[in-house]
UniProtKB/Swiss-Prot annotation:
Keyword ATP-binding: yes
Gene: guaA
Organism ancestry: Bacteria, Bacillati, Bacillota, Clostridia, Thermoanaerobacterales
Descriptive protein name: GMP synthase [glutamine-hydrolyzing]
Listed GO MF terms: ATP binding; GMP synthase activity
Keywords: ATP-binding, Glutamine amidotransferase, GMP biosynthesis, Ligase, Nucleotide-binding, Purine biosynthesis
Keyword Ligase appears in the UniProt entry: yes
Amino acid sequence: MGIKRETILILDFGGQYTQLIARRIREANVYCEIVPYDISPEEIKKIDPKGIVLSGGPASVYVKNAPKCDKEIFELGYPVLGICYGVQLMTELLGGKVAPAPVREYGKTEVVINNTIPLFKGIERDTIVWMSHTDQIELPPPDFKVVASTENCPIAAIANVEKKLYGVQFHPEVSHTHRGTEIIRNFLFEVCDCSADWTMDSLIEQTVKEVRAKVGNHKAVCALSGGVDSAVAAVLVDRAIHDQLVCIFVDTGLLRTNEGDMVIETFRKNYDMNIIRVDAKDRFLSRLKGVTDPEEKRKIIGNVFIEVFKEEAMKIGDVKFLVQGTLYPDVIESGHGISSTIKSHHNVGGLPEDIGFELIEPLRMLFKDEVRQVGKELGIPDEILYRQPFPGPGLAVRIVGEVTEEKLEILRLADSIVQREMKRFGWYNKVWQSFAILPGIKSVGVMGDERTYGYAIILRVVDSMDGMTADWTKLPYEILESISTSITNEVPGVNRVLYDITSKPPATIEWE
């Protein structure tokens, strides 16, 4: 949002760990931004960063059309740290030589470092690092010294201490590198002389000022879903403009048991906010009648949501701004770096820009963990801050096939049992998501002395850091047994429970 502060720039060459680099820097209370690798020297000078990091990437620097930054970047006087592909590119551009490695290194590797240089200050001479490379430096650039080596990689790090140009072949941002955090902190504080001024307090204060200046005397609306992002965005903007903000909670009829009541009660109890609750259950269900295609269901839900939201906003009058809980990974994914992929997020709170309002996105430079930190500072209750992610289209994407009131009731009850048992066993906050799915298949069963023909419920529990990839959770058998027994005993019409043991990829977390 245009906040002027000490900044580290991360040039993105498509590495799988680029966002992890950013998180490690932010954890040190230093602000950073991920930018396209082809950013111009002029743009960099305008930003005037404290330092620059060149990320890893899948390419080889010596092949045609390999992504390369402008060589002039190394002449601007800013400290630079190249990581993996980044150090190879630095080598290539500054007159050294990179070639395929005779022995490719993957995984934990012992490295011997020169700990007299600022980058490795306080690090043991022998330490463990995470390697993942198929190329290596054969000859460092002129005026660079070799400052680390492994058994198979004689040039594992290089440095031009005078010009503050450093490069490492390993990945300090990955937790498997034993002293990786210290190496990154050394770059920030020993090399770049950062002052650790990135705090949630300062962010809140600055954002409040900027929102006030932008909104002026106009009104803003926010689609409140009860999720973490919309909640933090709403409370933050409410702190800035209070009476000028109206939050609209659209009850789609596709929510979990008592979810609408819980959200409204939580906000009204803790905050003096303008909240409008719209009951649009019948409208959503009637439009979904007979629809079985998952993408069609999503589109219908999104369109109806926009219709309802816009109608309510028009009733308020003089609304100029729309508050959205966009996060930094969304900004990166829809950006221009080579690792970018344009994704259609299924968050129905993500309204299109052409809805007729100017956007306010107070969280757009934050990662999820930082959003929760801001929420903590704002006093948002834990039951909101630590809720598991829930898809925008709600239970509609957890019912395979047509959505009906009967199926919604079955799924709500089954899902409430999953949440109850996960909390009872102390596992709710240990996993990324835990929920029930109604796949629309029926099977034969026996209850008492009678044959039954009932629905199956699928249990889905996954571990993840960010939802981009996920592993199925190895739940203890006693929890699985308790969930299964409770569902088949308490949910009418269900006689079987299955456990989905597929990771993402190849599957997605949600079924539709």
